[in-house]
Structure formats: structure tokens, C-alpha cells
Amino acid sequence: MNQVIENVDFDSYISSFRKHLYHLFREEFDYGSISLKRDFPAEFLAEIMKKKPLAVAIPKLHAGRGVSVKECLAVLSAASYESLALSLMFGINIALFLEPLAKYGNFSVQERVFKDFMENNAMGGLMITEKAYGSDALNMKTGYEHIGNSYKIKGEKHWQGLSGAANYWLVTARKYTTTGELTRDIDFFVTENGNPEQHIPMVERYNNL
């Protein structure tokens, strides 16, 4: 499947993906009822992801289609036509997790995470905003310290998408100095929610997108 997605002509792929979404949203499932709740049913989402739409934001080196802006936008457009909620889900994964990871992530992390996306339809989001500071990243209070071969992150994030659904998070934090102050620079960490040592507990969840 991955090899087919990687090499198939994109015009053929996106046409097939649009037809796939049309069939799922308008024929196979009752989207009118599904849309009344926040989350897509697991079976419904699994059917959507069979076409590997997030492959457009994964490098070819990792069996993706190569992180083409044109292809990413086409997938978002196809999703938007059937569901804004689906488009938002894809947009968060593509623009806020996959593209930054592809551009800045360590190769070993890329290899492991992208494989999970391609083989298991994993999802990822970004944790940057905080309830008291919004988008004022320079005032964020989430901090980290380097302990041996690992990092310890402490803080609370306020996020409005993919809460409870993401398998991975791109978390922003500022380094603690020896005096306990926070530096101005912001660093990014990839956490895996299925790993007990990296799991980020959810304090509150809202019934929205």
C-alpha cells in the first residue's frame, strides 16, 4: 500500500480520494448523525485513513509522497468539501506536526514516527499555547531540564484540537537555568502518548472541534 501511495500519479490519487470520501460521507455512513458528536467513530475514521491522506506530508525517504505544498492543499481541499472537522484534523496533522517534524526533527525520531503514521495511521498535534498567555510564546511557563540522557518537561498547555486523539505531540518548552528562571529560547519536543513516561494527561476537554 505504501509503495502504491508513494508512486501513484497524484491526479489519479486525489480523484480516487475524493470519490472515497464521497462514498463514506454520503452513502456508507450517516454523517448527519456522526457530525453531532465531537469525535469521528473509530470505524469511520479508519475507513477514511485507508487512502493514507497524510502521506502527502511525509518525505519520500520515509515512504511518503514528499511534503509537496500543492498535494497537501489538495488533500485539505478534498476533506473540506465533505467535512470542515476532517479538514481541521488533517490541517493540524500536516501543518502543525508532520511538516515541522520533516523539516527540523532528528532522523531517528522521523523514522520511527513517520513509520507509525504510514503503517498505523497515527496522528499528531502541537502543544504551544497556554491558558494564561495564548499565543504569547515568549511568556510561556512550560519549562524543561536536561537530566542525564533524557528531558523532563513541566507545564500545562491549552489546546483546542486533537485532544484525546493524537498519538504524538510536538510540545514547546523553555529551558530552566541553574537559578530556576526560564530562557527566552523555545525548544520543541516530540512526545508519544502511548509511552507511560511521555504520556500527557488531559485535564479538561471541550465538546468542539
Question: Where are the model-predicted features located?
Answer:
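Amphipathic, small/basic residue-rich leader segments at the start of a protein or domain
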Residues: 1-92, 112-116
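A short, Trp-centered hydrophobic/proline-enriched beta-strand micro-motif
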Residues: 56, 119-129
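N-terminal glycine-rich flavin-associated loop
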Residues: 62, 86-108, 127, 134-137, ...
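Short acidic, glycine/serine/threonine-rich loops at helix termini
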Residues: 69, 101, 136-140, 163-166, ...
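Buried hydrophobic positions in well-ordered alpha/beta secondary-structure cores of metabolic enzymes
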Residues: 75, 106, 153-155, 189
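A structural signal for short hydrophobic beta-strand segments in well-ordered beta-sheet cores
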Residues: 142-145
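A short core secondary-structure module
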Residues: 156-202
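Glycine-rich beta->alpha junctions and the first turn(s) of the following alpha-helix
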Residues: 202-209
